[in-house]
Amino acid sequence: RELLGPENYAFFLGNDVVIVLDNIIYGENKRYKEGYADHVLAFVKGLERLLPESSDLYIAQHSPLRRRRQDFTNEKILNANDLLSIVHGHKTMFISGHSHVFHNHEYSNDVIDQNIAAICGAWWDTERCTDGTPRGYKVYTKNNGKLEWYFKPVDHDKDYQMELFM
């Protein structure tokens, strides 16, 4: 914190607001839970009171709102419903990583959760993530109120689609 600054912060981008949250709750022996600690919820609640109703929110965080379990079912992370109730009324885009796979979940017309495949591939071991996505990142633009995005692989141009090996 002394070197990098706070782990929870926000800034305006035009009328919209980017909120950066720490949603990893560390326990003992390197164990952690994915979710929102009480102080994180309090931060967002205090911030939301200051925002114009017309502001769209972009919440950048490590873990997505939904966690994929080993049996391939999904469950929301700890206190996700509390956070969703705080930001209710704003168009909200959650942008996360953590899983090294691409996954989009649309909760409603106003809430989208985008989990982006990692720029490091599968933990720096390969050029691909575990779902086959090449390592890369997303680029977001907003023009005339319309949000658009595309994925940009690290070693290819933005129009790159796939490679087939036979």
Segments from the language model and where they lie:
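A short, hydrophobic/aromatic-rich structural module that often spans a beta strand
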Residues: 67-76, 113, 160-165
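Flexible, glycine-rich phosphate/dinucleotide-binding loops
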Residues: 27, 66-67, 122, 146, ...
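Extended active-site neighborhood of metal-dependent phosphoesterases/phosphodiesterases
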Residues: 1-55, 72-95, 104-142
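A short C-terminal boundary segment appended to hydrolase-like catalytic domains
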Residues: 138-166
